[in-house]
């Protein structure tokens, strides 16, 4: 998003009223309209009770025609599509009274008074999520932010929320109410009439229909699509030779895997039917074959056969990790084609009352309808409120966490000083894209990664860029900085602080490191207690870069307490930046190696 569009979004927020009748849905960042949000959109656009609502759906430009055709097929003509990051999209983002997401809200979204955010999730997790799978730490920040912005969370079961709350380190950070009302997308599994009609229209009424939906491999930012597709191609060709003539297998790769399977020459295996809702098609199937995907929990609503085809079972569980061993599920687990074919030919059916109660007890034909009624003025469902955490909250900005004495000392300082408090560490997520293991050094702290969008540390309005350039000129010329320009930039800092830090409240901000200017700006405008810990590399940069020195001194002027890593550093600071009136102390984080300089 460029400066012009960003300024337009802020203008819309400031000048356009929130419209309580405008509903906005963004599914998988505009890549599709699927799962829970498809089910909700269908309910809102086809039921007379919601005719007063205007329904807008986000999509990417390349997906517009396919999504329009999908919605037309299901009679969802009242939907208005807005292209992600277009002016129309920004208007809706700024003014919609109700906003839905199944992954995260736009990274630059700032919730207004009168807007309510509703977050669902795309499945009951078997494979690890969030900080439990640190290879995806780079993208976790905005997903975590989505949960903290939410006013209402739609969860299929208690297990799913427990896993999400723990894996995204959300304890005490979420203020939303939770509804355990089943998954809206699963309501279709209870529609036997629709199942029979679709089987007839697809020409498989007399076939044994098998669906194959494997999950993806790799990281969200680096899906190993080619290797997985090549492996699946070989496996499917082998499976095709072994299937019975009354069997047809519909194969569908995960949306994150953009590779295409070559199925035209196979006899029994074809591509998953296009132009239809995935769950509508799943309801027509007799058997689901999957692996570690959440779809297996959803399909369990049907009580039909489920087979786990985990050809990389030991490797996947070891490298990616699962919340429990897939072998504990009440379904056959197959690691090769022979065992898979045997499982497909075995008698249907399974029974496990404990599994059903734990994962799909809330699902029903009317789950989606009941949920929409709950949200938009109809009969209410039971809501669970999150407990309030009274513990003092300390936010620590930790910089890059390079291996060495500074990081080792910081670890001990934070643990000893704030051990009785709730400690949150925050950092720029891009710094740990390839070095996420550095974050393992702080197991006692809750992580609050700042999600840098499109490579920008900060986003500015035109007048704020002008103010920044004015300040830079004054610094370069050795002149006093204009107070009005400084206040304009302070307002930018307040807005970015809200956006980056999920609009959560903290009792103390401890800036422990980092060579960026943006966090110094946020520190200076933080409304509560501020501690700044000065380290060697910060003072070294201040000596080389007058602009950094200005913002560092500005932050220290506003600090309630300044801690120096050692006495020599304190003396050098006075020579370079001057004296400060707040409480100051020598922390003795590491020896005075600069003594005598």
Segments (PLM) and residue ranges:
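Conserved catalytic-core segment of nucleotide-activated headgroup transferases in glycan assembly
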Residues: 33-41, 46, 183-261, 334-336, ...
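A short, active-site helix/loop in glycosyltransferases that binds the activated sugar's phosphate group
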Residues: 152-176, 519-520, 538, 558-584
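Active-site proximal beta-strand in glycosyltransferases
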Residues: 112-129, 307, 508-513, 520-541
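Catalytic binding pocket for nucleotide-activated donors in carbohydrate/polymer assembly enzymes
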Residues: 180, 260-267, 294-359
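N-terminal pre-catalytic "stem/leader" segment of glycosyltransferase-like enzymes
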Residues: 1-88, 389-493, 498, 504
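A donor-sugar binding/catalytic signature common to diverse glycosyltransferases
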Residues: 97-128, 276-318
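C-terminal amphipathic helix plus adjacent low-complexity
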Residues: 337-402
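Membrane-proximal helix-turn-helix segments that form the acceptor-binding/catalytic region
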Residues: 138-155, 495-503, 538-539, 545-562
């Amino acid at each position: 998003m460029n400066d012009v569009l960003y300024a337009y979004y802020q203008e819309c927020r400031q000048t356009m009223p929130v419209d309580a009748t405008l509903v906005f849905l963004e599914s998988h960042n505009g890549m599709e309209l699927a799962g829970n949000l498809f089910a909700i959109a269908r309910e809102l656009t086809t039921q007379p009770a919601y005719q007063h609502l205007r329904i807008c759906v986000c999509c990417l430009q390349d997906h517009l025609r396919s999504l329009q055709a999908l919605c037309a097929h299901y009679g969802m003509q009242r939907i208005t599509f807005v292209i992600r990051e277009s002016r129309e999209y920004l208007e809706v983002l700024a003014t919609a009274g109700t906003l839905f997401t199944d992954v995260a809200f736009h990274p630059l979204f700032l919730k207004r008074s009168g807007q309510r955010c509703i977050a669902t999730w795309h499945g009951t997790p078997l494979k690890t999520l969030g900080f439990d799978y640190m290879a995806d730490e780079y993208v976790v920040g905005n997903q975590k932010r989505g949960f903290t912005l939410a006013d209402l969370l739609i969860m299929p079961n208690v297990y799913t929320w427990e896993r999400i709350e723990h894996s995204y380190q959300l304890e005490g950070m979420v203020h939303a109410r939770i509804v355990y009302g089943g998954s809206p997308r699963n309501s279709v599994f209870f529609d036997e009439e629709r199942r029979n009609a679709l089987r007839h229209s697809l020409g498989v009424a007399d076939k044994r229909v098998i669906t194959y939906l494997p999950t993806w491999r790799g990281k969200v930012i680096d899906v190993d699509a080619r290797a997985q597709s090549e492996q699946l191609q070989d496996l499917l060709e082998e499976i095709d030779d072994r299937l019975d003539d009354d069997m047809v297998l519909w194969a569908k790769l995960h949306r994150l895997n953009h590779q295409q399977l070559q199925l035209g020459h196979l006899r029994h295996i074809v591509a998953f039917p296009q132009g239809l809702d995935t769950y509508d098609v799943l309801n027509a199937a007799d058997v689901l074959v999957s692996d570690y995907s959440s779809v297996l929990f959803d399909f369990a609503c049907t009580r039909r056969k489920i087979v786990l085809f985990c050809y990389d079972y030991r490797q996947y569980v070891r490298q990616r990790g699962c919340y429990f061993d897939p072998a504990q599920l009440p379904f056959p687990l197959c690691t090769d084609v022979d065992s898979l074919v045997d499982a497909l030919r075995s008698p249907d059916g399974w029974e496990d009352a404990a599994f059903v109660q734990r994962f799909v007890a809330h699902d029903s034909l009317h789950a989606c309808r009941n949920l929409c009624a709950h949200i938009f003025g109809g009969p209410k469902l039971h809501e669970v409120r999150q407990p309030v955490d009274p513990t003092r909250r300390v936010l620590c900005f930790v910089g890059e966490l390079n291996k060495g004495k500074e990081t080792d000392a910081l670890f001990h300082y934070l643990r000893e000083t704030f051990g009785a408090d709730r400690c949150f560490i925050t950092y720029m997520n891009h710094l740990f894209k390839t070095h996420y293991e550095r974050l393992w050094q702080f197991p006692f702290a809750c992580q609050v990664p700042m999600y840098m969008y499109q490579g920008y540390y900060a986003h500015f309005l035109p007048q704020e860029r002008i103010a920044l350039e004015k300040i830079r000129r004054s610094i370069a010329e050795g002149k006093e900085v204009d107070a009005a320009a400084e206040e304009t930039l302070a307002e930018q800092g307040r807005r970015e602080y809200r956006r980056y830090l999920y609009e959560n409240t903290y009792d103390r901000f401890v800036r422990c490191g980092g060579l960026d200017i943006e966090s110094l700006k946020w520190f200076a405008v933080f409304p509560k207690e501020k501690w700044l810990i000065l380290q060697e590399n910060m003072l070294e940069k201040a000596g080389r870069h007058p602009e950094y020195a200005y913002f560092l001194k500005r932050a220290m002027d506003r600090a309630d307490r300044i801690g120096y890593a050692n006495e020599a550093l304190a003396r050098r600071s006075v020579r370079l930046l001057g004296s400060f009136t707040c409480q100051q102390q020598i922390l003795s984080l590491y020896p005075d190696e600069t003594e005598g300089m």
